[in-house]
Amino acid sequence: MIDAKTLRLVTQNGLQQFAQGFILDGIAALRTLLPYCAKEAIISVEAENLEKNYHYMLSFLRNGGSDEKRNDVQAKLQRQGVALLEQACRTIRISLDSDLYCNALNRLRDVYGGQDALLDKWNSLLTPEEAGDVQDDIFDLLWTSPFWTAEDTAFWYDFLMQQRDMVQQHLEGAIFLSLWEHYDAEKMQLLGLMAESDCRRTHITALCHLMLLRIRHKELVPLMPPLPKSILSRKEKKQIAQVQHELLLMLVSEKDMEKEMKEAEAITKELFSGKQPLNAQNIKDMISLRGRYLRNRLQRGLDINLSKIPLLHTCKYMRRVSHWFMPFDKTHPLFQSVMIDDKGREKENLSVLVDLIMDCDVDKLAMLYLVAHDKDFSKAVQQLDEQELPDNAGSVIPEYNLRFIMQDLYRFFGHSPLHAQLANPFREEVTLLDFPELATMFSIDDTVACSELLFELGHYKQVLAAIDDVISREGASASALLLKGRVMRERKKYAEAISCGRSAELLEPENLEVLHFLVECYAWLGRYEEELEYLQKLSDIMPDDKSLPRLIAATIDKVGRREEALDLFFKLDYEASPDDDGYDELTSSIADIALALDKLDIAERYTRKELDLSDGKKWEAHLRMGHIRLLRKHRTEAATPEVNTEVDFVKQKHPAEQNEDGNDWKDAIDSYEQFINCFVGQHVQEAGVAIAKFHESWGMLEGKGIKRADLLLIQDILQAAASGTLK
């Protein structure tokens, strides 16, 4: 008997062959499966007819026959081959009886015997709980249903139209799942009909499913039924782009959560290792970290609840596949059991909370189940309902939209009982932009919006392909050229990146993002004159931006006009307050430039100010103070006539006994040791790493007259002191 893995591989290969027009190769794959589904004689008969008809066609053409409809016949044979392959695959899969699909199918047969009995029960008088159970069974019936005829499509469309909207959406999910596992053109037709529903929620759910099925069965897209005309209207074309955007947002949400987890792990790792004590600052850091990421997710529309998934989705309620597609509303039995008190009244406070909670349906249902079946959750709910009713005036209740649909699907494909056996659209490299007939429905703004998310995910090749395609169709825009430039910069093609930025500037001369991008590019290349030019442009557009004058002053310093830079920094210092953001950087810049200009008094004054602002915790300031004091020592020695070149350190007086003017050497050593202690404490590094930082300054110090021999002595002093071997 064939195993499940081989079955999938043979089927997939055959589907690709039929879809690409290699009908003989597709038939060969089909013939491989026929011995394993011999009980379904109709499949073998239809497969034999398919092969005969194709050979008749080939022989006819070979012998000089002419048929203007030959391509139509060819496409029809392709569709027949695909259908037969999927039927054979499903038949063999059921015979293997090795997964939840088979279990659901067998359970329906055991309980109901057939479709008619199940639908009769659905139409009988049922309690809400009984109706929910039967609805789940109808979901399983549609999910595991065999391949449809046109009559089946008509029957189920009529059936769905008789149900209320929430039932339609739930059972629509079953058809989507059935199609995800085994492509069926007739079921695709039904989804197309549902996409034309007047109910917005039904419409966007079907639209989303139709788009994802194109990713799932990408090789079969040419053989799929055309999209409904309503979807191709100008307004609905926008929604196709939104489907892709929301899918990519989920991947960015995932990446953002991973980034948060790494940062949190770094904090907790230091706590658990004992390198940092648990104190108020640690707790504050953790809360601040969480708050920062939460604000970012809310602003960007990212999923804020991914971290709750392990808790919610392991509950018993989510073991039933149909529950992953269940729409949530207040008529749901779970809501009724939790939110309605013994007197039949709705618990107002908790109801307000459920209305406002930013959760997709899957999360809401799982949470309500836990509330109903977990004592701790129940206690928390009771306490909440006893609180004063919150004022929700002006609150915005989230609308069920594409974002929640995509969040539900992300959870299904990543955590449902079926996740291990299903192809995951969130792990596919293919996007809707890769389909030419769909890409043309993306406006240039839509394309850029999706491509920016692809850029964030590191899919640079796809970004370039999408941007080049849309520019060729609609012409360039500043945002498209800017994004292309960012890709070029990531690929270290700086000349091309700058070219894109300059072209974007021509289209929008005052586009701040473009100007900032060019500033960054020129700074990266060390082309400081051009960097300064674009900083000046930004300053002209944003005269109230306090950060730009500092950047301009720093860039003037980089081009070698240090006196001018220092004067500008002095002016900024005069206008600034120690409470201003970035004031410590301002003092640091003045100290650095003053040191470079050998204005040691100014450098020392601003370095002391920098240390005061940081409570002595800034290692860069301690390092600079060491340089200043060492240079003062050098100046003193240079101005004093040399009397005795023979130095006996043992016979010299203790440094503390020397006069005050002779302590620069010791003061320099003290500053360097404070630098090492501060650096090691902040970076959890060995002292050797800090000493290497000191070594990076040797070129500057030697250029100002400090002897390498003295620098070597200082380095040995620092190493010996750090190791504890120096008395």
Give the label of every model feature segment:
Residues 20, 457, 491, 525, ...:
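Structural motif corresponding to the intra-repeat A-B loop/turn of tetratricopeptide repeats
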Residues 26, 463, 497, 531, ...:
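Single-residue signature of alpha-solenoid repeat helices
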Residues 38, 475, 509, 543, ...:
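Short coil turns that delineate tetratricopeptide repeat
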Residues 339-508, 520:
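Alpha-solenoid helical-repeat scaffolds
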Residues 470, 503-504, 537-538, 571-572, ...:
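Canonical positions in the second alpha-helix
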